């Protein structure tokens, strides 16, 4: 029975990973530009995003496997769950986490930088002339990546040398003391994980909080589209006015612009440029209405218009979910600030839940029937991931106030895509702390596990005394709880980071308040401000689409000419 249950849990995880591959693929193919696609860049981005999401979504497997050793109705371990069996489960999960965290660090710190430099080194002219070989390109990319290798080496050295905290507080339980990184290998991984989460928190605070507020508001109060009748009428009126003014100026000079004054010539040049822009806008509006489109596209446009009310309902549902997440995080943060056993000395670790947390309660109850909790957590994680993507596309990739790259659907360059993937990886690592430690701390630590709170020597289960069944907690001194309760490996990893290096724990904790404040400010701003159509961005996209259309038509023309010339040559050869 135990083997069957364990196999089913891992089978569900395999299905979820397959879904994550599809999610990552859809994201990458949706955002990358069709003109500059690179299979290596695409593959790297998909693997990196899948790996990080798989790490976060290993949590329900962790909780399900550790909770499968106990009976929550009786508050005792199941007959098969000997300490050896429990240790095997914990060891397997620990090995999987080590593998995933190591893979995540490798992809983020080495693989993505290498692929970025490898793509940057590509020179089409040099390749065609034979000046740039594949080996030379790889070597140049490796030379640039050496700086990142040096960073990894420094991290390893610092992780080896930095001493862990010396916890002397008598209130700290033996369980937490045992979490202190004991060997050098654990110290390196613990320190590196803490540093990467800290880096990710800055992105999480800026992008995820913004996206979490903007996403539902975009669905509820969508900006006017190019198919909007008012916008179309305004564009047509502007185009007609523009052409009328051009006719006046051309009539004044009788077809010879040299007769116009310098001011009028500048005005005419501006009118010609504006006319091209207005024609592009008019073409976009016609395409949005299905004119000149295939039957499939016209059917798709009608379907999306029909289901537009569902978008409004979806936006309201997402808004309610995000507000519930915000409230749950705020309640847990206040609970940590008030009831943490050793405050900043151990990174604000919370050993027991003192405040009701709605999201945590939903997870604990759903965990009793696996995989309901898995489905709920997957929705929450993908919502936060999607919010991070929306935040990055809204703000863009910036250095201070300078925008380096735009991230837009169908217009994201491979370099921007790699940087976005690296940012998302760090953001997801920050989520890997926030979800278990603030959104659902009890669920992420013990799940639905309970113990029978009876004095030692009495009956070990509470079959006849249901009121003595209590949820597992690190704070309890009952030996039965220590014998029955098994904390998740996720909670052990994260608590080890915060208790071994309290500085990280303090940064993790206070950054959550900044996240909550920024979310609230952006949400209020989104409520007040009415969304507008970004005509500048629209013109840029229309210009890029026109350039791509011209390039495609010219390439097709060259191909037809080549075929016709080849056909004539073949005919001449046969005739000869």
Swiss-Prot record:
Membrane-crossing residue ranges in chain numbering: 8-28, 40-60, 98-118, 145-165, 188-208, 312-332, 347-367, 377-397, 419-439, 503-523
Molecular function per GO: cobalamin binding
Annotated spans, Disordered: 549-576
Membrane topology label: Multi-pass membrane protein
Biased composition (Polar residues): 561-576
Sites carrying sugar chains: 570
Compartments it resides in: Lysosome membrane
GO-annotated biological processes: protein localization to vacuole
Chief location bin: membrane
Gene Ontology CC entries for this record: vacuolar membrane
Keyword Nuclease: no
One Pfam short name: LMBR1
Alphabetical keyword list: Cobalamin, Cobalt, Glycoprotein, Lysosome, Membrane, Transmembrane, Transmembrane helix, Transport
InterPro entries, per the entry: LMBD1_LysCbl_Transport, LMBR1-like_membr_prot
Family that this chain belongs to: Belongs to the LIMR family. LMBRD1 subfamily.
Function recorded in the entry: Probable lysosomal cobalamin transporter. Required to export cobalamin from lysosomes allowing its conversion to cofactors.
PANTHER family, per database record: LYSOSOMAL COBALAMIN TRANSPORT ESCORT PROTEIN LMBD1 (PTHR16130:SF2), LYSOSOMAL COBALAMIN TRANSPORTER-RELATED (PTHR16130)
Official protein name in the record: Probable lysosomal cobalamin transporter
């Amino acid at each position: 029975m135990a083997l069957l249950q364990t196999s089913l849990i891992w089978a569900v995880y395999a299905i979820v990973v397959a879904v994550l591959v599809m999610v990552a693929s859809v994201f990458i193919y949706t955002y990358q530009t069709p003109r500059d696609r690179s299979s290596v860049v695409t593959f790297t981005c998909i693997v990196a995003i899948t790996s990080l999401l798989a790490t976060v979504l290993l949590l329900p497997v962790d909780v399900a496997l550790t909770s499968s050793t106990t009976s929550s109705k009786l508050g005792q371990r199941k007959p098969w769950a000997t300490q050896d069996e429990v240790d095997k489960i914990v060891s397997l999960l620990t090995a999987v986490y080590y593998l995933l965290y190591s893979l995540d660090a490798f992809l983020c710190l080495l693989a993505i930088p290498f692929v970025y430099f490898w793509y940057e080194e590509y020179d089409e002219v040099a390749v065609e002339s034979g000046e740039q070989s594949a080996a030379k390109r790889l070597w140049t990319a490796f030379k640039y990546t050496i700086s990142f290798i040096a960073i990894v080496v420094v991290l390893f050295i610092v992780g080896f040398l930095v001493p862990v905290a010396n916890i002397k507080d008598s209130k700290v339980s033996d369980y937490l003391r045992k979490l202190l990184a004991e060997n050098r290998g654990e110290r390196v991984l613990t320190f590196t994980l803490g540093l990467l989460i800290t880096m990710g928190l800055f992105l999480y605070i800026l992008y995820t909080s913004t996206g979490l507020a903007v996403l539902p508001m975009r669905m509820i109060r969508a900006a006017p589209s190019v198919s909007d009748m008012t916008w179309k009428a305004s564009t047509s009126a502007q185009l007609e006015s523009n052409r009328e003014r051009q006719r006046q100026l051309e009539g004044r000079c009788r077809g010879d612009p040299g007769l116009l004054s310098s001011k009028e010539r500048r005005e005419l040049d501006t009118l010609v440029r504006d006319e091209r822009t207005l024609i592009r806008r008019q073409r976009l509006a016609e395409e949005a209405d299905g004119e000149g489109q295939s039957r499939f596209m016209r059917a798709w446009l009608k379907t999306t218009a029909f289901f537009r009310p569902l978008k409004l309902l979806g936006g309201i549902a997402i808004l309610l979910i995000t507000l519930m997440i915000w409230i749950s995080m705020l309640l847990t943060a206040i609970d940590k600030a008030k009831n943490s056993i050793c405050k900043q000395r151990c990174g604000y670790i919370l050993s027991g839940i003192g405040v009701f947390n709605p999201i945590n309660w939903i997870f604990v109850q759903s965990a009793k029937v696996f995989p309901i909790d898995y489905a709920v957590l997957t929705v929450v994680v993908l919502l936060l991931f999607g919010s991070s993507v929306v935040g990055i596309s809204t703000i863009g990739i910036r250095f201070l106030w300078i925008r380096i790259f735009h991230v837009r659907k169908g217009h994201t360059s491979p370099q921007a895509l790699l940087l976005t993937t690296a940012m998302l990886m760090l953001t997801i690592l920050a989520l890997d702390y926030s979800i278990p430690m603030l959104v659902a701390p009890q669920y992420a630590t013990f799940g639905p596990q309970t113990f029978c709170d009876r004095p030692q020597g009495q009956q070990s289960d509470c079959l006849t005394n249901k009121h003595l069944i209590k949820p597992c907690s690190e704070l309890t001194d009952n030996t039965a709880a220590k014998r029955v309760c098994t904390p998740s490996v996720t909670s052990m990893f994260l608590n080890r980071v915060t208790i071994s290096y309290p500085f990280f724990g303090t940064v993790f904790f206070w950054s959550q308040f900044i996240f909550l404040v920024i979310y609230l400010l952006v949400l209020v701003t989104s409520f007040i401000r009415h969304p507008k159509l970004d005509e500048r961005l629209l013109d840029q996209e229309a210009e890029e689409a026109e350039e791509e259309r011209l390039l495609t038509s010219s390439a097709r023309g060259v191909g037809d000419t080549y075929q016709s010339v080849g056909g004539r040559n073949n005919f001449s050869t046969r005739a000869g």
